[in-house]
Amino acid sequence: MSHYTLGWHDQQNKHYEIGEYADDAFEAVKHAREDVPYLHEHPFSLDSIKKEQ
């Protein structure tokens, strides 16, 4: 399991990040969309996924 940092911008162009633990990036995105209502409503607003070392 690895730590991922996911970033996105809202409609006011404010940048946000969330950290998720997951087996891969796809699972990290799934968890982020479950945890953040905005990402659930706007699933394509994610603009970065970084696997932390």
Task: Give a label for each model feature.
Residues 1-16:
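Short aromatic-glycine-(Arg/Gly/Cys) micro-motifs in beta-strand/loop hairpins
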Residues 13-27:
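A short, exposed loop/beta-hairpin motif centered on an aromatic-Gly-Thr core
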Residues 15, 34-53:
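Short, mixed-charge low-complexity intrinsically disordered segments
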